[in-house]
A protein has these predicted regions:
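Flavin (primarily FAD) cofactor-binding/catalytic cores of flavoenzymes
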Residues: 2-37, 41-42, 76-413
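N-terminal glycine-rich dinucleotide-binding loop that anchors FAD/FMN and/or NAD(P) in oxidoreductases
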Residues: 46-73, 211-228
């Protein structure tokens, strides 16, 4: 059975819901397809129990569902965030087909796209890919060399310390998720080994404001791929947390409090983890990242003539005294769990045509495909700006898409 409909939105996360809201405000025919049973599934099922929103509540800017609570500078829990998605979808009666997995999107010569699900097919003029940028959890190729007696999984499967087998834990990756999970584990009494990367340290608050206020006010997240420096293009979310009122995460502090810091992982040979001797280098990059962040904030404050009291941030050096460990016998160290915090990758496999540019980003300035009429991307960083992946810009991003949909006319049934 083939149903004709003007627009199909794939994904019922924040970008998909915001696009649906805007289309409904204009009376445009559409449907959201989502494989889960409720909206915001990645937040619901791929975040740990104590997860809190990393950006302050005031940044929750779903159009028509902006944060209106009593704590704009606080941080929502996972469950509160999910409840807001549910209430939003119910309040606006958004047309969502849950438990509906899209298996392919094909071009139909001269007349749009054919979207196939396990049960049904849709002929549509417009497809809005709103599945987000962070889809498939990454693991290194040598993950299968980890001894079978050791439990291993991606951060998306982590829930709490109590759910893990007894013993030490190796966390591979020190970005936001890896650092937050490592902190929770060692604070719960676990022995934690943390293989570091190059995510920058950053102050949670600086010169009287939260880091997100400075990122927003300074225009940093408004920059396009072309406008950003190489470091900006390789933007790695800084080590901060929204837990316990919000705080900075710092590898030197982790070291002081008992975590064992390592360089980045290279391989597993005969049950031993092979590590690069680059812990000090990684720490240096993390520290330099913070210096660059605050340097940019200071320059903006001066440029804008703002009255913001000067602040000297604490200087931590503990990690530089840690030994460079290049081989780690997992079983001898009592490590019974490995958590891969290596980030995510985008999965374009449902699309039966190619649309990625040389940088691996959809060729879609403003979220609007340059090559395929009626193909749109919502909620992806750099489409059009870095902030497109944040709640802060979800309304701005989707409004551009909806304007183009409206301008394309209605689908002839």
């Amino acid at each position: 059975m083939v149903e004709s409909i003007e627009t199909v939105i794939i994904g019922a996360g924040q970008a998909g819901l915001a696009t649906s809201y805007a289309l409904k405000q204009h009376g445009r025919e559409h449907i959201i397809l989502d494989k889960a049973s409720a909206p915001g599934n990645s937040w619901r099922s791929e975040r740990w129990d104590s997860f809190t929103f990393v950006s302050p509540n005031w940044t929750f800017l779903l159009p028509g569902g902006e944060y209106d609570g009593s704590d704009p500078d606080g941080f929502m829990t996972r469950d509160e965030l999910v409840r807001r998605f549910e209430r939003y979808a119910e309040k606006y009666h958004l047309p969502i087909a849950f438990n509906t997995q899209v298996i392919s999107v094909q071009q139909v010569e001269g007349s749009g796209y054919l979207v196939k699900t396990l049960d049904k097919e849709y002929h549509t003029r417009n497809v809005v890919a709103a599945t987000g940028w962070f889809q498939l959890g990454k693991k290194p190729s040598f993950a299968d060399k980890i001894p079978s007696s050791i439990l291993q999984f991606h951060t998306s499967k982590y829930r709490n310390p109590q759910s893990l087998p007894p013993g030490a834990v190796l966390v591979v990756g020190s970005g936001q998720s890896g650092a937050q999970i490592a902190e929770e584990l060692y604070q719960s009494g676990r022995k934690v080994f943390l293989a570091t990367g190059v995510a920058p340290h950053a102050p949670r608050r600086y010169r009287g404001k939260d880091i997100f206020r400075w990122l927003y006010d300074s225009g940093f997240i408004d920059q396009t791929f072309e406008q950003l420096s190489f470091q900006g293009r390789e933007f790695v979310a800084p080590m901060i947390s929204g837990k316990d009122g919000g705080h900075a995460l710092n590898l030197h502090k982790f070291c002081r409090e008992g975590a064992i810091l390592l360089g980045h992982t290279l391989d597993v040979v005969d049950g031993k983890l092979v590590l690069a001797p680059d812990l000090k280098e990684n720490l240096g990059k993390a520290d330099m990242g913070q210096k660059n962040i605050v340097k940019n904030f200071d320059a903006y404050i001066q440029r804008a003539g703002l009255d913001a009291p000067l602040e000297d941030l604490p200087v931590w050096k503990d990690g530089y005294q840690a030994p460079e460990i290049t081989s780690l016998d997992l079983q001898a160290e009592g490590i019974n769990t490995v958590i891969w915090a290596c980030g995510y990758t985008y999965d374009p496999s449902i699309f039966k045509f190619s649309f990625l540019d040389k940088n691996g980003i959809p060729d879609a300035p403003l979220g609007i495909s340059s090559t395929y009429p009626g193909l749109f991307f919502a909620g992806i960083p750099f489409l059009p700006s870095l902030g497109s992946g944040f709640f802060l810009h979800v309304a701005k991003n989707t409004s551009l898409i909806v304007e183009r949909v409206i301008g394309s006319g209605h689908l002839e049934h």
